[in-house]
Amino acid sequence: MTFPHRHLLGIEALRPEEINTLLDLADKYAALNRQPDKHADALKGLTQINMFFENSTRTQASFEIAGKRLGADVMNMAMQASSVKKGETLIDTALTLNAMHPDLLVVRHPQSGAVDLLAQKVNCAVLNAGDGRHEHPTQALLDALTIRRAKGRLHRLSIAICGDIAHSRVARSNIMLLGKMENRIRLIGPPTLMPSGISEFGVEVFNDMNAGLKDVDVVMMLRLQKERMDGGFIPSEREYYHRFGLDADKLSNAKPDAIIMHPGPMNRGVEIDGTLADDINRSVIQDQVEMGVAVRMAAMDLLSQNLRLTRGAE
């Protein structure tokens, strides 16, 4: 099975078999990453530019490590000091970079759709590292790989996504991916943080944690995205934790072997009790971080193969 995509802009364009192709390759890279010599040559001779218009620590580091382990020449652009801050448009930036002939662009941007726009203006492969509230495809893919490794499968599971659904690109990408793989998805959160009409996407909506977590296999907690809120979405963090934060009492409604996930960064004592986050028997949060590097290696490997084929045919 090939991966017939020039870019990785979102989950929406991926078919289930393409998702499995990427995850299968990521599994191999996960094994490589545990070896003393973690390097491969899939991106040897290629240039990777990371452009983060939003602050990021873990995602940018993950992409940088992934590129370097595959042999790419990796450049991190300081967008806070770039020409964009001096008035240059995103399109002008894209055209300027395109003239330098990079091979892969990794882009995070605060505006939904900005990465798609940039991809239309360049000749290289583009990976969406998160755009506004729209999508975060590699996060959904690494979550999927984490679930598959922990549960032995990625289908017919009951999965609860809890918290700030309305502002979360992670939730959007996960809903699409997990839905494509025939899972039962439950969304749990206050009405103020639930997108209108979301039940039309084949998910179940709950405003009560105890009811929503009943017999689920996976509990995925989300961060409160305060930077995207422009009003009083919650009474207080203390009240939010009381009603929607994951603690032992609420978790007792899930299956005994249910796993706990969080895309990070975590607000301990707001979305999740710190003891649960560190529970080595239930929490797979650090596994998510580990799988992030493997998934991004797989994504860039597959896109680079198409890039070389395209250039070879020109």
Swiss-Prot record:
The biological process GO terms on file are: 'de novo' pyrimidine nucleobase biosynthetic process; 'de novo' UMP biosynthetic process; amino acid metabolic process
Coiled coil stretches, renumbered:
none
For the keyword Lipid metabolism, the answer is no
Catalytic reactions on record: carbamoyl phosphate + L-aspartate = N-carbamoyl-L-aspartate + phosphate + H(+)
Reported EC number(s) for this entry are 2.1.3.2
> Which pathway does UniProt place it in?
Pyrimidine metabolism; UMP biosynthesis via de novo pathway; (S)-dihydroorotate from bicarbonate: step 2/3
InterPro entries in the cross-refs: Asp/Orn_carbamoyltranf_P-bd, Asp/Orn_carbamoylTrfase, Asp/Orn_carbamoylTrfase_sf, Asp_carbamoyltransf, Asp_carbamoyltransf_Asp/Orn-bd
At which positions is L-aspartate bound?
A: 86, 169, 223
Does the keyword Transferase belong to this entry? yes
GO cellular component terms listed in the entry, alphabetical order: cytosol
Q: Which PROSITE patterns does the protein's record reference? A: CARBAMOYLTRANSFERASE
UniProt-listed Pfam families? OTCace, OTCace_N
Q: Which UniProt keywords apply?
A: Pyrimidine biosynthesis, Transferase
The protein's GO terms of the molecular function aspect are:
amino acid binding; aspartate carbamoyltransferase activity
Q: Which Gene3D superfamilies match?
A: Aspartate/ornithine carbamoyltransferase (3.40.50.1370)
Q: Which residues make up the binding site for carbamoyl phosphate?
A: 58-59, 108, 136, 139, 264-265
Subunit field text: Heterododecamer (2C3:3R2) of six catalytic PyrB chains organized as two trimers (C3), and six regulatory PyrI chains organized as three dimers (R2).
Q: Describe its function.
A: Catalyzes the condensation of carbamoyl phosphate and aspartate to form carbamoyl aspartate and inorganic phosphate, the committed step in the de novo pyrimidine nucleotide biosynthesis pathway.
Q: Which NCBIfam families match?
A: asp_carb_tr, PRK00856.1
Q: State the similarity comment.
A: Belongs to the aspartate/ornithine carbamoyltransferase superfamily. ATCase family.
| Protein name, as recorded | Aspartate carbamoyltransferase catalytic subunit
Q: What organism is the protein native to?
A: Roseobacter denitrificans (strain ATCC 33942 / OCh 114) (Erythrobacter sp. (strain OCh 114))
